[in-house]
Structure formats: structure tokens, C-alpha cells
UniProtKB/Swiss-Prot annotation:
Domain S5 DRBM: 45-108
Function description: With S4 and S12 plays an important role in translational accuracy.
Official protein name in the record: Small ribosomal subunit protein uS5
Free-text note regarding domains: The N-terminal domain interacts with the head of the 30S subunit; the C-terminal domain interacts with the body and contacts protein S4. The interaction surface between S4 and S5 is involved in control of translational fidelity.
UniProt organism field: Bifidobacterium longum (strain NCC 2705)
Keywords: Ribonucleoprotein, Ribosomal protein, RNA-binding, rRNA-binding
Assembly and binders: Part of the 30S ribosomal subunit. Contacts proteins S4 and S8.
GO MF assignments: rRNA binding; structural constituent of ribosome
Pfam family, one: Ribosomal_S5
Segments for region (Disordered): 1-40
Family: Belongs to the universal ribosomal protein uS5 family.
Length: 233
């Protein structure tokens, strides 16, 4: 009888140990997933679905339908990318487009929410012209170009689309134009000229004001953080 009692106690103890280990493993997995979600939430990006096309492919047994999504992704602060995704379901096509856009992100030179100089981009039969604009002008553009500007963080710009009106051509022409943008220092160095001979005074003043505003915002944020830490102590 004593042996049976000891065996029962040992079995219950082993079961509790296994449950404890399973609980720890489960909690570890849940914790990892929770951490990944928090990291992804903290690294959020803007995304815009420009267009979704239905594609049909004919086989011997009939036709197969799929969807193609053109997606723009950016951080709203000078970085943007465009991607194209295909799948038999719309959500999967959009997800693939987002991943493709994140792989092709690039930086866009800006001065207080506008571009540094006029530029023209091309793709196939599509042409897009971009011009700097004064603060408060807004984004004067169609839906396809506007999506790229919003994700890139450009708030004031004048645009004109010529030639093909296909969304894919317009977006790619816009990206081609943005990739041609240069900082004034780069243009001056390439031409062997002084900075004030390349960039207009208004542009240089606007950039200096933007840099001063950004520095002030960083200092205020650092001071607020230091005050919070001091109050917490």
C-alpha cells in the first residue's frame, strides 16, 4: 500500500513538472509573439494601395483569375518604396505588394516638406513633372502621384502627369523623378560651383529654418524625457 501511494505521488509530481514545462514553453512562445507585435507596431509604415487589377489566364480546362496590387509604402519622413504583388486573393496580393515595396525603399531629399528642385521622370509612355512649392500649397497631384507624395512625406509640391494615364506607369514615372533629386551640395560639387551659385537664396533660407526647427524639436523632446525620468526617480 505504501508503495502504491509513493508511485501515485511520483506520477502526480511528474505530471505537474510536465505541465509546468509546457506552460513555460507556451509562455515563452506567446512572449516572443507579443514582442514581435510590439516591435512591428513601433516600426509602423504608411501604405497606400494605388490600384488592384484582375488578371485572367486561359488554360485547357478554363480560365484562372488572379489579382495584381500596386502598393506604395513609406515612413512619411523622406523614405518611400513601390511594390507589385500578385495572388489569387486580394489580401495576399496586397501583402506581397507591401513586402516588395519595403525591399525597394529609397530616400528622397526634401526641404521643409517640398522637393529640392524641379525634376521630370519617365516610365514607358508616362511622364511626370514635379516642381517645388511654397509652404501651405499642399500636394497638387492626381491620386497615383499623391499616394507616393504622402508616403514620402512631401506636403507641398506641384505636379503634372503627361502621356500614359495608367496607374503603374504614372507611379513608376513618379519614382523615377524622385530618384533624380539631389541635395544642393551634391549639385555644387558636381559642377564645381559655390553653393549659393547653385541653390536660390529662398531654398537655402528655408532649409536653414527647417534644420533649426528640427534641432529645437529634438531638444524639447530630450528635455521632456529628462523631466519624466527625474519625476520617476
Amino acid at each position: 500500500m505504501a508503495e502504491e501511494t509513493q508511485n501515485t505521488v511520483a506520477t502526480e509530481s511528474n505530471n505537474e513538472d510536465r505541465k509546468g514545462r509546457r506552460g513555460q514553453r507556451g509562455e515563452g512562445r506567446r512572449g516572443e509573439r507579443r514582442n514581435r507585435r510590439e516591435e512591428n507596431h513601433g516600426d509602423e509604415l504608411l501604405d497606400r494601395v494605388v490600384t488592384i487589377n484582375r488578371v485572367s489566364k486561359t488554360h485547357k480546362g478554363g480560365r484562372t483569375f488572379s489579382f495584381a496590387a500596386l502598393v506604395v509604402v513609406g515612413d512619411g519622413n523622406g523614405t518611400v518604396g513601390v511594390g507589385y504583388g500578385k495572388s489569387r486573393e486580394v489580401p495576399a496580393a496586397i501583402a506581397k505588394g507591401q513586402l516588395d515595396a519595403k525591399k525597394h525603399m529609397f530616400s528622397v531629399p526634401r526641404v521643409r516638406g517640398t522637393i529640392t528642385h524641379p525634376v521630370q521622370g519617365h516610365d514607358a509612355a508616362g511622364t511626370v513633372l514635379l516642381r517645388p512649392a511654397a509652404p501651405g500649397t499642399g500636394v497638387i497631384a492626381g491620386g497615383s502621384v499623391r499616394a507616393v507624395m504622402e508616403c514620402a512625406g512631401i506636403t507641398d509640391v506641384l505636379t503634372k502627369s503627361m502621356g500614359s494615364a495608367t496607374a503603374v506607369n504614372v507611379v513608376r514615372a513618379t519614382v523615377d523623378a524622385l530618384k533624380q533629386l539631389e541635395e544642393p551640395e551634391e549639385i555644387a560639387a558636381r559642377r564645381g560651383l559655390a553653393l549659393d551659385e547653385v541653390a536660390p537664396d529662398a531654398l537655402l533660407r528655408a532649409r536653414a529654418a527647417g534644420i533649426a526647427e528640427a534641432r529645437k524639436a529634438r531638444e524639447e523632446a530630450a528635455a521632456a524625457k529628462a523631466a519624466e525620468e527625474k519625476d520617476g526617480e
